[in-house]
Amino acid sequence: MATSERFLPWSRATVFKHSPALARLLEHSFQPGSPETALNCPTLTATHAALLECAPCKICQLVYSLASDPACEVAFFEDYACLCFYALYAPLCWTSTFMAAADFLELVSRYFPGAVGEGGLYGPEGIMAVDLQLHFLIKRCFRPVAASELLDVCNLHFLKSEFLKGALTGSVSNLFCFKSIWGSMHAPAVKQQAGGGGCGCCGLSSSLSAAAPADKRRAGGGGGAAETRRPEFAEAVSRAFPQGGGRAQTGVKPELLSVFLDVWGESDLLSEANREMAAAAPARAAGALGRFEFTYPETADRCQGPCMLSQALQLKKSNRTASICVLCECIAGHAEGAEALRLLKRDILTFVENNVKIPDRISFIVRQRDSLVYVRDPLLRGVIRGCSEQEIHKHLFCDPLCALNSASACPDILFGEPGEEELRILKSSLAIGNHLAENIFLDCEVLHTLVIIFKSIQLCKVGKTTFLEIIKELNHQLKNHNLQTLHTFHTATIYC
């Protein structure tokens, strides 16, 4: 039975309310500590099984069974749709998966407490991190799809699953030929773009902003030096989440970045400076928001941390960068994160007129005592300054996933505090399928698929021809969507 308290995703209070269950999910999100235990590791077995394209989606199965209950309240549909809406505007990163886990557990325990069971909702015998990722962030099962487009979408999802399996196991099948499969796909968006045309799916009228021109929406993704005003939401959304100046009007939710630091403090992910900041968390939390307590399992690979909640499924490091981007976590975990990084990128580009290398520009700016003065929260400022020059370079100028996250995420939605009436109207609209078909800032299933494939081939072995074909196609798509990054071959060879 529902409580009188309203459901609002991305809330810090939800994390602490369900901390024991989330700790269980984290415990089963580690790589095994030794090769001898890998074959019988329940986490790896369950994750690999979920990535099979013939495997059912555990979230879809559970939601369908709950929704089929005659006693199911209308409010459940509204709140579930609200969570899906937040996931649509969240970056693809560790924090987003973690928050989806917290919010989904809150929904199930609120409306169907008997469905949780004594063993909990999360674990090898139930729902795993990969199930949450696939449903809410990678395949987005909640999105409306026309019958004529379903097979095309399934083909793209197959490619995502195949390369994610490669990231998990370390290699993609020798029988797999990307060029042959990609070239034979009959998806209209693939064929149109392969022929030199624009992005068909991003040119469609959005359910959120039917009047927004395609070129304006693509420019809203940014990535270049020039700033373009983002498209506007439909009325029901804009009333709940006024963009820009609306933050002061509606308020802002507490940050989640400190929870990320709490969980990752013992791993090898954080830089020395950020590790010290994580170690100082108890002093900060004494009179503030509280600390998320979590103990790493003894038999797990503690160096990699709970990496299975990340799309990378492992923690790999190269040239002072990692397969899990701390700056993407800043976007998902702090209301100021996206704007702070946008302003930092502007400062880097305009720092000097000479042909100074970007990593040098970054180091000069970060060294200045008054750098990032526009960031009000010292925690966020400290985390950004604690990142290496290479991490900042990778996030702002190189990595296609970071560029995609920066273009499509919406802090106004994730961290806004909508009024009661505005939220009620929005949820009613979401429950009948409105506003879930497309992210109005940047939404292309072809590009999304290629980015996931690219991040996977950074972590697993593929043939030389396959590698180069993926690089070529991804560069073409990034250019089509006005996402200006360094050539992805450059990124793939030096960074994670």
UniProtKB/Swiss-Prot annotation:
It is found in: Host cytoplasm; Host nucleus. Pfam families: Herpes_env. Residues 325-402 are annotated as: Zinc finger 2. Keywords: Host cytoplasm, Host nucleus, Metal-binding, Zinc, Zinc-finger. Zn(2+) 1 binds at residues 57, 60, 135, 141. Zn(2+) 3 binds at residues 201-202, 444, 481. InterPro entries: Herpes_env. GO terms for cellular component: host cell cytoplasm; host cell nucleus; viral envelope. Residues 57-141 are annotated as: Zinc finger 1. It comes from the Viruses. Residues 201-481 are annotated as: Zinc finger 3. GO terms for molecular function: zinc ion binding. Zn(2+) 2 binds at residues 325, 328, 395, 402. PROSITE patterns: HERPESVIRUS_UL32. Plays a role in efficient localization of neo-synthesized capsids to nuclear replication compartments, thereby controlling cleavage and packaging of virus genomic DNA. Belongs to the herpesviridae UL32 protein family. This is Packaging protein UL32 homolog. It comes from Equine herpesvirus 2 (strain 86/87).
